[in-house]
Amino acid sequence: MRRLSCALFVVVVLLVGVPAGASAQSYNPITPTKANETITLTGKNMTVQQVVDIARHGAKVRVSAAHRQSSAANLELVLEGARQEVPIYGFNRGGGAEREVVIFEGDPLAPETAELLVQRRYDGFRLTGVHGGGEQHTGLGPEVADEEVIRAQMAVTLNRMRYSGMNPALVDLLIAMLNERIAPVVLSRGTDGGGDLAQDAAVRAAMVGVGEVHLRGQRMSARQALTTTGLRPLEKTVNSIGVYAGWGGHNSYTDGQAALLVHDAKQTLDWGDLVFAMSMLGLNSSVNPLTAVPQNIRAFPFVNWQARRLLNILRGSYLFELELDPNNPEDTHGQRLLQDPLSYRDYSQRNGSAWEAYSRLKKNLLIEINSGSSNPITKVGTHPTDSWELNTPWIKRYYVEPAGNTEGGFILGSANFDNTPLNDSMEQFTLALAQSYVGTLERTQRTFDPFFTVVRTVGSYGFLEGFPEDVQCNVPHADSFAMSDILGELKSLANPVPAEGNWTERGIQDVQGLGRAKVAKARLAVDNALYLISQELLSATKWMDNRRVQSPNRSFGAAPTAAWQAWRVISPCRQDPNERELSETWRINLPYSFLKGNPASNFLGAASGEPNAARVRYRTHRALKKARQRRKALTRLANQPVGRGGVVSRRP
């Protein structure tokens, strides 16, 4: 009891530590637990974990030598292309509706031309003019509340610079801003998904000392933050801001969040599997549907994998032993039923499909963040003989002959900024998630019915009939009302964002992707799923306790036992009724924070032994501290309007 009192006291202190006057637009800085680590970005093999370590945990960054060489080579290709009169969108030609407007002719580094281009670039970064032609976009509020979202955007942008022509000074400053934790104030709307131009513009503005930023969580002007950290804004020179920056067209604001989504989705799916296995142990379920015979007859790879995973989690548990009825030894079924409800039997099919959708989502994300998405696309070392279409008169018009400091290559207009493959996979995953976790509420309700549990319970605590109450757990059951509400929201989030076709830029930009809305909905859906799983945890562990009361020698298997014992560190089996009101206050947030702060991977590899109680408490309470802020930020992003009437950005 003393252990629970201490844990709850820490929770109360952490929560009241939030300033009472904190505004709805409060800022959520990261906790830089990996600030002593440095990640090298190559542009070719960025991982989800690297994005998370940089964005969420404050890891520092650098780029590889090959990354720098590629970026410099692409810049040389563009400069030589202009000298050879190759039409280059956004450089010697305008952008957007001005795509046929000639900006300059000849050598871009000729003094008068260079002065013009540097001024245009500088004005574009300062948001006082145009960036490559066409409209300028500054976005639409509210501000992004989470530092991790902005850092994820910046990290993905930096990784992609391998495929664009960039001055080294620009690359170096972006690295330094990440390493010093300078996060520009970014507006969350004003992008249509065909290039997150408004959000990119906020980062570029900070690089020339314009606008506001957060420096390690403290808000100030961009110029002050750069000065404080010993950095210099980009200057209006050829060697600083330069005459060209192939930045346009990235969806890094959306893609960075998608990386956070994929990471959090994996943790949610892992916990879903472990808690479901614990529910099976609580119900005394039949493992028959998971076995090789029915699975091999219907060879859906992810469904079969899901079944095998559950079997491995449950291996060594009493579910594989005969359940003999002491009153009828000849009945080998005993208290285990022949068939469970569909919310149990269907899990491998439903969640196997969710894992399949997750796999596709992760695959598309990794392609996206390790690819060039600018317009135009520059590719050094390509030749007309590489492919038949490249050797046709029209395409050869965009070929740069080897000369000077470049080996030549193509500069071609592209639609690589279109995020449809990633957007579709995010929506498919959200739908699969809702299809799977509709069963969480149903499973918690089946434990009230002896038609499924084969044993009767009495009283509000669900004590087993016929056993002393003082040896049973008086802990709360899942909150069915809260689960119904969260599940309803999850199902609504599964509805896709309608396809958009809005006339902008004189019709050049006439379809929109709206990736920022899709990733926001998916992230909130994952969060909702974790809340549902956390409530199922209450039911599953309560019934694991009941099964142990029935038969103290029952084994639950290594991973379920480790997770069950860890949860009992936070929520002991026996609690003082006088603390019931306080305990009920955290009926929703405490189990959620336990799952958030203690990844299922901590237990899935567990062989045996007691959990590290101090570590479990610390991680749970740290997650609880941020739970409300996180929920508020995710909900705000997911509930923003989309479509007609919203602000859209110029096609890059």
Place the predicted regions along the sequence by residue.
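Bacterial N-terminal signal peptides that target proteins for export
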Residues: M1-L8
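Bacterial N-terminal signal peptides
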Residues: L8-G17
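Boundary at the C-terminal end of the N-terminal hydrophobic targeting segment
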Residues: A22-A24
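C-terminal auxiliary extensions adjacent to catalytic cores
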Residues: S26-S70, N74-A82, A114-L116, R120, ...
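Glycine-rich loop at the start of a catalytic domain that most often binds anionic cofactors/ligands
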Residues: A97-A114
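Contiguous domain-boundary segments centered on the initiation and propagation of an alpha-helix
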Residues: H137-D200
